């Protein structure tokens, strides 16, 4: 099975207008990504406010994204849920629509044991036939995979990658030393992506690449072509943006940035609220300093 989880993957925002999906804005956003030659996109993940969508909105968003992309790059659906049966349903609907893979985090709030986490993913794996990227994001879920659970899950044939949004930079080394099959490790934090790659990572699932996909793609390419100095130069240039995108809960700052660039409204779903004036000013100054052209 081809491993689609590598390189620069953009975690796409979900644009709204008048509390409905703005599908015209979605097309502009996706074409911007495709033109920058990103390796794949994630739809309805954390950055895409997936947990704030109704099931009907989720289906419409995925179907529209799949139609717009039209097989030019892989489309990965966020299928995370606290309820295993619901996660299976999200994966089943995604499969019908024709996505290329899933990104799934452990259930949040419930705080399952490692045994429960394993059985959750095993059930989704057995109910589907598409590749899965595990998503470690303990700051949101309240639980994380142990190395042992990652190793055990990697033995399931279609679990092919881990997106790691934690801060344990030794983990890629530890995981690579015990997993024999091709199992890709991707960073879930833009600011740590080069350090993560240096420890065995093969890419980044990025928030910043919503705003500047060409620079983020160039950074990953330079690194993997052994141009460490060039990659580091881009990374240093983008560091203020990385930091600004998390001064408030993601995706509040990136949603404002995309509005400022003209892609969509600044509308965000409760319980999230729009960026403060201080954050807006910071985002505007950084975008201006980067001379981003869309």
Curated annotation (Swiss-Prot):
GO terms for molecular function: (R,S)-4-hydroxy-2-oxoglutarate aldolase activity; 4-hydroxy-tetrahydrodipicolinate synthase activity. Pfam families: DHDPS (PF00701). It is an enzyme of class 4 (lyase). The record marks 46, 109 as: Part of a proton relay during catalysis. One of its GO terms (biological process) is glyoxylate catabolic process. GO terms for cellular component: cytoplasm. Its main location: cytoplasm. Pathway: Amino-acid biosynthesis; L-lysine biosynthesis via DAP pathway; (S)-tetrahydrodipicolinate from L-aspartate: step 3/4. InterPro entries: Aldolase_TIM, DapA, DapA-like, Schiff_base-form_aldolases_AS, Schiff_base-form_aldolases_CS. CDD domains: DHDPS. Its EC number is 4.3.3.7. It is found in: Cytoplasm. It comes from the Bacteria. Keywords: Amino-acid biosynthesis, Cytoplasm, Diaminopimelate biosynthesis, Lyase, Lysine biosynthesis, Schiff base. It catalyses: L-aspartate 4-semialdehyde + pyruvate = (2S,4S)-4-hydroxy-2,3,4,5-tetrahydrodipicolinate + H2O + H(+). Pyruvate binds at residues 47, 205. HAMAP family: DapA. Belongs to the DapA family. Catalyzes the condensation of (S)-aspartate-beta-semialdehyde [(S)-ASA] and pyruvate to 4-hydroxy-tetrahydrodipicolinate (HTPA). This is 4-hydroxy-tetrahydrodipicolinate synthase.
